[in-house]
Amino acid sequence: LRRQRQMCIRDRTGVAEAYLDSSPMFVISGQANSKILQYQMDTGIRQKGTQSLDLEPMVSSITKYFAAVMSPDSIRFHMEKAYYSAMEGRRGPVWLDVPIDVQNRQAPEQMKGFDIPEDKKTDAEISSEALERLAKSEKPLVLAGFGVRASGSAGKLLEFCDKQNIPVVTSRGGIDVITTDNPLFVGRPGSYGDRASHFAIQECDFMLILGSRLSVSTIGYYPDRFGKNAYKVMADIDRKEIDKRDVPVDENY
C-alpha cells in the first residue's frame, strides 16, 4: 500500500489493511442484477441470485463510504462522493458495488454530481500554557507519526525541530518522517523499539505528539507510565483517537 489513490477490484483483506493504514483506496465490485440485490436488501434473505450477496454489512466497518449503484444516473454522484470520502480527513478505502444490469446500461451525459461540503475546520492554536512550557523546557521531544507524512507536513516539522533543536522519535507509521542520519533523530519506541527512544520518552519534560494515535505497540500496556515526566500535547486529525480514555495527554487538538 503506497498511501496514495489506488484502484482495486478485490478483495476484503487488502481493504481492511488500507483502512487500518489510513490509505485511500477505490474499490469497484460487480454484483447480481439490481432487482435481486434489492430483494435481498429488503428481506434479509441470505441469497437469491446465483452469485448475489449483500456486501454492505460485510465491508461497512472497513470503508469510509459504501454504495450499491442501483441506477446509471447516480454513478457520477457516487463516484465523486466516494473519491471525496477517501481523501477527506483521515484517509481510507471506499467501495462501490455495481449490479450487472447497471453495468450494461448507458449512462446519460448529464448527471447530478456530489457537492463538496464547505470546509468549516479552523486551525487550532496551541495554548499559551503549552507554549510557555515548551519555551522553558530543558528536555523537549517530538513524537512524529504517519499523520505528519500524510498531511505533507514533514518538511515543516523538521524545519521547526531544527530551529528549536528538538530531538525526534517516530512511530513505525512515521518511519520516513526523518532520516536516521539526521542529528535530531533519536529512534523508534514501542514493542520493537530501541533503547535510546525509550530513554528519551521517559526523560523528556515536554512532548509534542503529532499524527500518532499512540497505539499499544507504541506506548505499551501501561499508558500512565508513558512519558511520565512530560507535559504532553497531542495533535491528530481523528478525534476518536484523541478521545481514547487511556491516551495520557495534557492537551489535544
Feature-to-residue mapping (PLM):
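N-terminal alpha/beta PP-like core and its mobile active-site loop of ThDP/TPP-dependent enzymes
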Residues: 3-6, 10-253
